[in-house]
Every structure is written in structure tokens, then in C-alpha cells.
Amino acid sequence: LQLVFDNSLIGVAIDRFGKEIPVLKESETQFRTFVEISVSKQFYGWLAGIGKGVSIVEPKEEQEKYRKYLENIWKL
């Protein structure tokens, strides 16, 4: 899974995924990382808690699943 985070969330990413995650500069304000995880509703909830500070970049299928998850919450 490829994720892009705001730079201010580096500690959050390390707390969640560990110190060994790759951290690549995406822009002046963001970094990209690659993680191997089992995606679940709990993971989506964690992402939603961070808000706009993180986004799923790849795979596109997972990005779409997360978007649908958020839409379903919005409909509640």
C-alpha cells in the first residue's frame, strides 16, 4: 500500500508502521511511504481519524474501497 502523509504526521506513521518504513519526499509538505498490511475497517477508521493529512495512492482499487467506506459512513 502506498500512502502519502503530511510531513507533520511522520510520528503518527512511525507509531503505526514502525521505524523501518521507507520515507520518500513527495513534496515540500508531504512524504510517501510503502507498507505491507492487511487492510481492514479498523485501518480505514484510523485513516479517517487522521483526515486529510493522509491519502491512499496505490493500489487504485484500495483507494476506491476507502472512498466507498467513507461514503457509507457519510450516509449514516
Locate predicted features:
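Polybasic (Lys/Arg-rich)
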Residues: 1-76
